[in-house]
């Protein structure tokens, strides 16, 4: 039976929103992952805390390949991920939600693919639509019905971290078309696509990026805003889980057909 995966980012560690939960671990070829399995209205849900349940893993140290491989092994076909982001776009204000549709990759030291030769062919992932349009539409519909300010579309700039960005970097990202900035969406989105899972990110605007606002950036500010948005996020995720047809097949589920499909 197909499952829905939820990857919780900063401030999103509470799997108790689901039913029949139990904690498990799984060894993958890339290391061990911890996860929580539960149900919601009869659908199987797998929850992974991206930074660890105690927020001990910084963005550049996250084992992205283990997380995605593990979710695939557990039968996940849809992934809803959450990210806390800064805004480069004056129309995307703190407290708003953004359903990212494109990204700019400014990471430096991360392994971004499962396809490194050896047992796998040389493969070139098509990322024309890296964030599943059908899943984004579901989230947009649910969010709008719930009265959220939710933007369907936006370009996420992913930086290496763990430091925040300089005002000069933010100015450059804005000139390149960036709308939000964060540290975790790449390579997660690429790996999910290689593993042929429909993937969408709910980005929560927690602050304006450096230089957009004159105030200094703090992690505490991010966590505080996440706390304020937590109830809305919970309702959005649960509403989306209700709306997802786990038997549906989208382009994302056949992303690697040219290479014989993704094999564990």
Each model region followed by its residue ranges:
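Metabolite-binding pocket within alpha/beta catalytic cores that recognizes anionic/polar moieties
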Residues: 1-128
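Short acidic/polar active-site loop segments enriched in Thr and Asp
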Residues: 77-78, 179, 198
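His/Asp/Glu-rich mid-to-C-terminal helical/loop segments that flank catalytic regions of hydrolases
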Residues: 210-257
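Generic hydrophobic/aromatic pocket-lining and core-packing "Φ" positions
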Residues: 68, 170, 186-189
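Active-site rim beta-loop-alpha module in soluble metabolic enzymes
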Residues: 130-175
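Zn-dependent metallopeptidase/amidohydrolase metal-coordination segment
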Residues: 183-221
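Non-catalytic positions within long, well-ordered alpha-helices that form the structural scaffold/packing
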Residues: 72-75, 174, 193
């Amino acid at each position: 039976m197909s499952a829905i995966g939820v990857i919780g980012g900063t401030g999103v560690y509470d799997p108790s929103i689901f039913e029949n939960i139990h904690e498990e671990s799984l060894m993958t070829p890339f290391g061990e992952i911890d996860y929580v399995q539960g149900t919601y209205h009869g659908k199987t849900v797998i929850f992974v805390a991206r930074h660890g349940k105690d927020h001990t893993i910084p963005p550049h140290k996250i084992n992205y390949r283990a997380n995605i491989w593990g979710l695939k092994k557990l039968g996940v076909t849809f992934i809803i991920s959450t990210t806390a982001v800064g805004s480069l776009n004056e129309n995307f204000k703190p407290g708003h939600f953004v359903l990212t549709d494109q990204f700019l990759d400014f990471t430096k030291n991360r392994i971004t693919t499962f396809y490194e030769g050896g047992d796998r062919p040389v493969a070139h992932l098509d990322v024309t639509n890296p964030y599943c349009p059908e899943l984004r539409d579901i989230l947009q519909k649910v969010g709008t019905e719930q009265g959220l300010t939710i933007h369907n579309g936006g370009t996420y700039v992913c930086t290496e971290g763990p430091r925040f960005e300089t005002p000069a970097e933010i100015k450059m990202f804005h000139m390149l078309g960036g709308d939000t900035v964060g540290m975790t969406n790449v390579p997660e989105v690429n790996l999910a696509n290689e593993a042929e899972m429909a993937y969408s990110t709910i980005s929560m605007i927690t602050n304006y990026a450096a230089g957009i606002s004159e105030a200094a950036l703090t992690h505490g500010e991010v966590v505080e805003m996440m706390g304020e948005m937590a109830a809305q996020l919970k309702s959005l995720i649960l509403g989306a889980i209700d709306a997802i047809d786990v038997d549906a097949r989208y382009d994302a589920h056949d992303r690697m057909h040219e290479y014989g499909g993704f094999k564990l």
